Design a protein with these regions (language model features):
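Interhelical loop and adjacent transmembrane-helix boundary motif
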Residues: 41-50, 210, 215-259
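Transmembrane-helix boundary motif in ABC transporter permease subunits
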Residues: 63-94, 107, 111-115, 169, ...
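C-terminal transmembrane helix and the adjacent membrane-cytosol boundary/short C-terminal tail
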Residues: 1-3, 83-86, 161-176, 186-188, ...
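Hydrophobic alpha-helical transmembrane segments of multipass integral membrane proteins
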Residues: 55, 59-71, 75, 187, ...
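Short membrane-interfacial helix/loop motifs at transmembrane-helix boundaries
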Residues: 14-48, 219-221, 272
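Membrane-embedded alpha-helices of multi-pass transport/permease systems
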Residues: 14-17, 21, 70-75, 107, ...
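Transmembrane alpha-helices
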Residues: 3-4, 9-16, 96, 150, ...
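Membrane-interfacial helix termini and adjacent extracytoplasmic/periplasmic loops
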Residues: 29-34, 38, 43, 86, ...
């Protein structure tokens, strides 16, 4: 069994190690090591197309993670007061949202937004004052942020609800006994207890949004995120520059995931 586990881990991580190794290749060929160099990292960071795509990815990831953290936390707290069959139904919907393949979410979001835009654009043209050009709703950063927020909300709900379930309910009861209002109890008791989980949900949401290609491919419109740029570049061949981008993204993602895990562990110790 141990040998099987080792083989599985090698199968998963050897390709990642190869990408990291060849990102330091001095030559242009991605499959032939010709010395050690960090020049591809410099070229990557000086490439304006990469920087524009990186900026878009950071904006989308931060905004989506922030919205998902706020709305997901609100939903998790609200679900605490629901019991019985309705609670089971909501739980099922949340887990289904996490399990749905990204391609399904991308196609469904694309169809939904196109339908809404087709209905609203003529209405805006009629209602907009004469002499001014009415705005035209189209695919872009807004649609991408909306799609990622809807997908990531379920993830935040699961993380925050797990922390809420592990909270010491006597603290909330003590706050009520001291005549604290529900809002004061949430602000001074509940929120500090679940904040590590909220922050962990934010970091995980940021990571998933930053790395996402499938949903972004459908709803980004003319905008280019870093995963879309990498996909377009790979179609022309793998280069050390692509390896450098992959290595940097991998490093940032691992750092965020480790930080999120530490926050969850810290929150678990505090709730006890």
């Amino acid at each position: 069994m141990k040998l099987y586990a080792v083989c599985v881990y090698l199968f998963l991580y050897i390709p990642i190690g190869i990408i990291a190794l060849f990102s330091f290749n001095a030559g242009r060929h991605a499959s032939q090591m010709q010395g050690f160099s960090v020049k591809w990292y410099g070229k990557t960071l000086s490439n304006p197309f990469v920087m524009d795509a990186l900026e878009n990815s950071l904006i989308v990831a931060f905004t989506s993670a922030l919205c998902a953290s706020v709305f997901g936390t609100m939903a998790a707290v609200a679900l605490q007061g629901i019991k019985g069959p309705m609670r089971t139904a909501f739980d099922m919907l949340i887990y289904i949202a996490v399990m749905i393949p990204g391609i399904v979410i991308g196609i469904a979001t694309l169809i939904g937004l196109v339908t809404v835009f087709d209905q609203l654009n003529p209405l805006l043209a009629v209602l907009w004052p004469e002499g001014f050009t009415p705005p035209k709703l189209r695919m872009g950063m807004g649609s991408l942020i909306a799609a990622h927020t809807m997908f990531l909300m379920a993830l935040v709900v699961i993380i925050v609800r797990a922390r809420l379930a592990g909270m010491d309910r006597s603290l909330i009861e003590a706050s009520s006994d001291l005549y604290a209002t529900p809002m004061a109890t949430f602000r001074q008791v509940t929120l500090p207890m679940i904040f590590p989980a909220i922050l962990a949900g934010f970091l995980l949401s940021f990571t998933f949004s930053f790395d996402d290609f499938i949903i972004a491919f459908f709803v980004a419109g003319s905008e280019t995120t870093l995963p879309i740029y990498v996909f377009s570049s790979i179609r022309r061949g793998v280069t050390p520059e692509i390896n450098a981008i992959g290595t940097m993204v991998l490093g940032v993602s691992l750092l965020l995931l480790i930080t999120a895990q530490l926050l969850l562990q810290r929150g678990g110790h505090k709730s006890r």
